[in-house]
Amino acid sequence: DIKSKEDSIAFSRFLEFTDNQLKELATRYPTVKDFWFDGTWDASVKKNGWWTAHAEQMLKELVPGVAINSRLRADDKGKRHFDSNGRLMGDYESGYERRLPDPVKDLKVTQWDWEACMTIPENQWGYHKDWSLSYVKTPIEVIDRIVHAVSMGGNMVVNFGPQADGDFRPEEKAMATAI
């Protein structure tokens, strides 16, 4: 969170750096179809929703037709995924993290494009050396979640965490093969 003048200056530098990185990606890879974001849960981003709207507009101008998930956006009141008026921010909802919509209570989700993001070990994004600290889903459980998402018109993002050399651990390779 931004708590001082120094924080504010540093955050402004971060936004400028991020703008330049996004411009570089959009111009080097003009055929990209989707920009996938994460991080609007951060208080400093939620307080600067103007920048998320700016970034989305900039990318759409640089890459016409590109899709952008709802994890980029925050409105001027700090709302994420959906603005204060209930409108989806982004081209598809990406608010289901490690959970799926309820097939009875959440039927509204079928009115727009959406995705759910899931880890294989609970609460471990990216690479983690030790999987023994948490429950690891079985291939059948992952397939069940994929079927659940697809049956409600959604997409399932399954997190695999590469090692430093870019390879995947044997357990992840076995999981991908089984799926």
Placement of each model-derived feature along the sequence:
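Mature catalytic domains of secreted/periplasmic carbohydrate-active enzymes
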Residues: 1-179
